[in-house]
Design a protein with these regions (language model features):
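Negatively charged, low-complexity tracts enriched in Asp/Glu with abundant Ser/Thr
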Residues: 1-31
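Generic preference for well-ordered secondary structure
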Residues: 6-8, 22, 36, 61-65
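Residue-level marker of intrinsically disordered, low-complexity segments enriched
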Residues: 11-16, 28, 39-41, 60, ...
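A short, structured beta-strand/loop element
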Residues: 27, 31-57
């Protein structure tokens, strides 16, 4: 049996002029790799959920359409995941 460490964390990110709480959860994908499920709430309290996958050298959003304030911060979300992965090991 292979043990996979559960990784979940939340971080505040300034997006669209407001601090927003992004929640991250790592899980396995069907190809044996890993994905991060990410969710955040918009101004109307609608939960926006999406996935990020490691492609080439960075974590990328793998679905759309998403609000521009989410996609504009993809590089920051990538940095937060990389930081957490370094600290979790």
């Amino acid at each position: 049996m292979i043990f996979t460490k559960n990784v979940q964390f939340s971080r505040l990110v300034k997006a669209d002029g407001m601090l927003r709480e992004f929640n991250f959860r790592k899980h396995s994908d069907s190809q044996g790799g890993f994905l991060f499920s990410v969710d955040v709430v918009d101004l109307r309290n609608n939960r926006i959920a999406f996935k990020m996958q490691h492609k080439e050298t960075a974590w990328k959003i793998v679905q759309s359409p998403l609000p521009e304030w989410v996609t504009k911060n993809e590089h920051i979300l990538n940095q937060l995941i990389e930081e957490e992965m370094r600290n979790a090991s």
